[in-house]
Regions:
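PAPS-dependent sulfotransferase catalytic domain
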Residues: 2-152
Length: 152
């Protein structure tokens, strides 16, 4: 019943999440994991989704950045007017953990496209946005993860 109430009134859900974040920050340092999760949830609730949004959702080390560049080239006819791909295609979870405001992302021109390693269901809130899911063989992901962590 509470879940139905929160679903119907998202502004209440946002206020509850902000209160919980403040509560867990004041308890102790061991609650950092919980406060980080809440910070991310608040960021996603404050993000204004559009019908033209494109989400590139993958498991880590599965070619996410390559897919970002491919989508950018298709949308801009090969224009390379950016310093880093995150300038034109932000990584939403990374932005949330850094404490960045979603205002900059909300000001990006349509169609916007985002990188994420989260579940794609988190972004689909009844809009007609698009999701690109990149699948890569599990053995290749494990090998790539191993070499990434070894050299990190």
């Amino acid at each position: 019943m509470l879940r139905d109430f929160l679903f119907l009134y998202p502004i209440m859900q946002l206020k509850i999440l902000k209160w919980l974040l403040q509560f867990f920050r004041s308890v102790n340092r061991k609650s950092k994991f919980i406060s980080d999760k809440l910070k991310k949830e608040i960021y996603f609730y404050e993000l204004e989704e559009r019908d033209s949004d494109i989400y590139i959702v993958t498991f880590p080390k599965s070619g996410t950045t390559w897919m970002q560049l491919i989508v950018y080239h298709l949308l801009t006819d090969g224009n390379m007017d950016f310093k880093h791909i995150y300038d034109v295609s932000p990584w939403l979870s990374n932005q949330a953990f850094r404490g960045a405001s979603p205002e900059a992302v909300n000001k990006l021109p349509s169609p916007r496209f985002f990188k994420s390693h989260d579940k794609y269901e988190q972004f689909n809130r009844g809009f007609n946005n698009k999701v690109i899911y990149v699948y890569r063989e599990g053995k290749d992901v494990a090998a790539s993860y191993f070499h990434h962590n070894k050299n990190y």
